[in-house]
Design a protein with these regions (language model features):
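Positively charged, small/polar-rich N-terminal and surface patches that mediate targeting and assembly
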Residues: 1-109
C-alpha cells in the first residue's frame, strides 16, 4: 500500500475531491495546513505573509497503477492554468507499512 499526500490550493480541493470520487477513490482525508515553498511567502502591499493556507489530502492506494491514477488526477485538477504556477502545491508518496481500524483493533493491510 502507498500513501499519496497532496498539498494544494484551498480553492482546488472541491474539484480534486470530485474527480477522485468519480475515478473510484472515495476514501480521502483532508486537513487544513499552513506553509510556504520556494517563494518563501508573499508580499501584498506592505503586508508580508510567510505562511499561506493550503489543504492536505491523504489518499491510501493499493498498488502502483492506482497511485499513478491518483497522481494524474491531482496534477490535472489542482494545476493553475496550462503550465501551472508557484503555489500549486506538492505531491508526496510513501509506503504504508500497516494500518489498524480503531473500533475493532484489527490490522487492515
Amino acid at each position: 500500500m502507498l500513501m499519496v499526500r497532496a498539498i494544494i490550493r484551498p480553492e482546488k480541493v472541491g474539484a480534486v475531491l470530485s474527480e477522485l470520487l468519480s475515478a473510484g477513490f472515495p476514501e480521502v482525508t483532508k486537513m487544513d495546513v499552513f506553509g510556504r515553498g520556494k517563494q518563501k511567502g508573499i508580499k501584498v502591499g506592505d503586508i508580508y505573509y510567510d505562511e499561506l493556507p493550503k489543504e492536505m489530502l491523504l489518499v491510501v492506494v493499493k498498488n502502483e497503477a492506482d497511485k499513478d491514477d491518483v497522481i494524474r488526477i491531482i496534477m490535472r485538477t489542482a494545476r493553475t492554468g496550462e503550465k501551472g504556477a508557484f503555489g500549486d502545491g506538492k505531491i508526496f508518496v510513501s509506503p504504508v507499512e500497516t494500518a489498524y481500524t480503531i473500533s475493532s483493533g484489527k490490522e487492515v493491510l
